[in-house]
Amino acid sequence: MSLSNKLSIRDLDLKNKRVLIRVDFNVPMKDGAITNNNRIVQALPTVKYALDNGASAVILMSHLGRPNGEAVAKYSLKPVAAEVEKLLGKPVEFLNDCVGPDVEKACQSATGGKVILLENLRFHIEEEGSAKVRWSKVKADAEAVKKFRASLTALADIYVNDAFGTAHRAHSSMVGVDLSQRAAGFLMQKELEYFAKALENPARPFLAILGGAKVSDKIQLIENMLDKVNALIVCGGMAFTFKKTLDNVKQIGKSLFDEAGSKLVRNLVKKAAEKNVKLVFPVDFVTADKFAPDANTGYATDADGIPDEWEGLDCGKKSSELFREEILKSKTIVWNGPSGVFEFDAFANGTKSVLNAVIEATKEGATTIIGGGDTATAALKWGAEGKVSHISTGGGASLELLEGKELPGVTALSSKN
């Protein structure tokens, strides 16, 4: 799966065409009101581009929440239609369903640059292909899925996918729209462009910074990165599993230890040596007497070890300096996983200092990519937008790409040639 060879909305002639755009309008809501419209704002450049380039109609489809394959009023996209209308500055017609004869008729007769928002795709079990009933999963009927996908296909002439955050899911709206031109929108294109820079043709030295809790959860990620990078910083909770297994530290107290992951550590270290990948671990820690924002804090080094009733919740100043040196040597940097429990102020400095070093490296010309999820949350919290090359919008999707997996929603896009 080449990331850099996918058809983009810029490659298409949109004049007098109906354009079906899969957006990600999965926005937080409270009492029927949108509490953060960022995802809607991010989708607008693709919508505006289609309108500015003569599309006869733009039809938007999205999911919201987890309604489990049935219509649930609190997950209706109706409030989103009003927000899109406000931000676009033009009327948006909201349809009460996303498939079926009435929806097909409304979309097929739309002209003059009309904008339509369909109701939540996940109100139908056929979107995700299954639903949870009590403790078991019920699969959607294959014939019904085919019909659902055919109805989505009937809505437009061209399909555009701008929902990178759902690209790792083989849902009907991601892989089942059978139009001859299936292109990436601007958000999707930017994600593919930057991940291609890292995974297909990185400027070197190439550094990965991997944090998070469990080695066993990140095994595929570490394995895949060891095949690609020149150096790897291991931080966050999973560093303790490495350090204890390799006897690099006297004792780790109550710090996270991943028993299953510990069995994989020696092979990973061996692979790093074979591939000539430099491994960098923290050497000192900010410790806590409990896992809480109001915990008493302490300090420990590898040589001292962490006392029995204490746990490491962040890396210390010496580690931050080590990490900074490695970051500033690098020309391509991918960061996935914070280096401490940044949600608690007392244990946020390690993650903050990694972020500052990544920003510094960006200024010096490095390509810097921050994976989605917690790392993106931390980066946005401290105002890094525009100061690093790319902050991914997809937690699970970016992780799977970095693990070397194919994303169904990307595979389904047309290639340029």
From Swiss-Prot:
A single Gene Ontology CC term: cytosol
Q: Where in the cell is it found?
A: Cytoplasm; Mitochondrion
Q: Which reaction does it catalyse?
A: (2R)-3-phosphoglycerate + ATP = (2R)-3-phospho-glyceroyl phosphate + ADP
Record-listed ATP binding positions: A213, K218, G237, G312, E343, D374, T375
Protein keywords: ATP-binding, Cytoplasm, Glycolysis, Kinase, Magnesium, Metal-binding, Mitochondrion, Nucleotide-binding, Transferase
- What is the species listed in this Swiss-Prot or TrEMBL entry? Rhizopus niveus
Q: Which residues bind ADP?
A: G212, G236, F342
**Which PANTHER family does the annotation name?**
PHOSPHOGLYCERATE KINASE
Which cofactor names does the annotation list?
A: Mg(2+)
Pathway the protein acts in: Carbohydrate degradation; glycolysis; pyruvate from D-glyceraldehyde 3-phosphate: step 2/5
Q: Which positions bind CDP?
A: G212, D217, G236, G337, F342
Describe, as the record does, how this protein assembles with itself and its partners: Monomer.
Q: Where does AMP bind?
A: A213, K214, K218, G237, G312, E343
* Cleaved signal peptide residues: none
Q: Which family does it belong to?
A: Belongs to the phosphoglycerate kinase family.
Could you tell me what this protein does? Answer: Catalyzes one of the two ATP producing reactions in the glycolytic pathway via the reversible conversion of 1,3-diphosphoglycerate to 3-phosphoglycerate. Both L- and D- forms of purine and pyrimidine nucleotides can be used as substrates, but the activity is much lower on pyrimidines. Negatively regulates the biosynthesis of acetyl-CoA from pyruvate in the mitochondrion.
GO BP annotations, alphabetical order: gluconeogenesis; glycolytic process
| UniProt cross-references to InterPro entries, sorted A to Z | Phosphoglycerate_kinase, Phosphoglycerate_kinase_CS, Phosphoglycerate_kinase_N, Phosphoglycerate_kinase_sf
PROSITE patterns (UniProt xref): PGLYCERATE_KINASE (PS00111)
Chain positions recorded as Mg(2+) binding sites: A213, D217, D374
**What name has this protein been given in UniProt?**
Phosphoglycerate kinase 2
Residues noted as binding (2R)-3-phosphoglycerate in the record, renumbered to the chain: V23, D24, F25, N26, N38, R39, S62, H63, G65, R66, L121, R122, H168, R169
Q: Which Pfam families match?
A: PGK
